[in-house]
Every structure is written in C-alpha cells, then in structure tokens.
Amino acid sequence: IREGYKNITFGENGSFNRGMCAVGDYVYVSGRSENSSGASAYLNKYSGVTGELVEKLMLGSEAAMAYYPCNDVIKDSKDNICITNLTLDASSNPLAVLWVNLEDGSLTKVASVSTTSKYRIDHVALWGDVSTGNFTVYAAIRESKLVMRWIYENGKLSKSETCTVKSTYSGSTFGMAPRMIVIDEDLLTSGKVELSK
C-alpha cells in the first residue's frame, strides 16, 4: 500500500472480511456487518495501484443466509465476481454462489450446492462462465482429503463428483478452511496438493 493510503483495516480480527480477489485494476474484499445469518453484506473495492478504498458496495438482501453470508468473494474464468456463504453443514444448509452486479450490488443466485454428508465448506473456486450458466464449482472439504465438484450446464446442475486425494502437505488433511485454486480446466490445487480433474 502506498504512503497515504493505509486505509485497509479489518475489524474483529478479519472475521467479517474473509475473502478477496483481484479483477482488472481493483481488489475486492468480502464483508458482512456481523457474524450472523441475517448480516448485511458488502464488497469493499480498492485500487490495485494505491490501495485507496474506491467504494463500499452494499449487496442485495439475498446474501443473507446460513451459516454466515458473504464469507468469500471469488471470480470465474471470465472475471465475473461472485460471493459465497460459509456453511457448517452443506447437507442441510447449501452453499450458494451469487453473481454480483458491480454497478448496483444486486445479486443473482447461479448455484446452490449441497452434500449428502454433514460437511463444512468455507471457500470454493469457479471455472467457466457464470453468465452463460456453464461453469464448475470446486470445494475442498474441511479436515478431510475430499474434493467436491459440481458441474453446471446451461444454468442447471448436471453432475456432482467427489474425489479423495492420496496425500496432503503438510498435515494429514486439508485443514480448517481450505481453498481450491483452479489453474486451468484440467488442474487445480489446494495448498501444496495438485489434482487432475
């Protein structure tokens, strides 16, 4: 951050601001007003050059959901910005992917994914284009070796898959709040583990 723009602060030790992504010349940081399912959600938009807070974009009320809303902000392969919730039990409280209109903060739900077992999902990754309805949602399951994939075609869930990785580094599982990073359509990673689709 350049001198004079030291305005990036995170209250409550960052528990209200758990995700960020860069698109173009800007960095977007997810935010919620409190740690509750009814919290209001927002994105802080920062200049990628100076670190200056450009805008606090309030998001639509559709963001409010269990367990905590607006836990992360992510982008797809075409730089469409989406937010996701934190779910402690994806079998009863699905993880939702909401596409953000960066002009007015309105939200469009593009995916709602669930699991057959009680899995916690903190973060997901996207590959594809949510604007066309053709994309894939990836998640590494907390404290496990499981990776889940939900494939959407023309806006509808067409397939879901689970894979177990052989090993993880540096522990025996992915850990507390793992993130998946899609490298290309055939390779993704969570920390030090590289997985082939």
Region spans (language model):
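Beta-propeller blade signature
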Residues: S40-G51, N93-D104, R149-Y152
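Loop-centered beta-sheet repeat module
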Residues: L126, G133-W150
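Short glycine/acidic-enriched loop and turn motifs that connect beta-strands
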Residues: S33-G38, T87-S92, R142-L146
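Repeated scaffold domains used in trafficking and secretory/extracellular systems
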Residues: N13-M20, E62-D76, S112-V130, S167-D186, ...
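Beta-strand-rich domains and repeat architectures in extracellular enzymes and scaffolds
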Residues: G4-G38
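Beta-propeller fold detector
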Residues: I1-T9, L53-S61, S106-T115, L157-S170
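Blade-loop segments of beta-propeller domains
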Residues: A41-N85
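Entry beta-strands of beta-propeller and related beta-repeat scaffolds
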Residues: D25-V29, D79-I83, T132-Y138, D186-K197
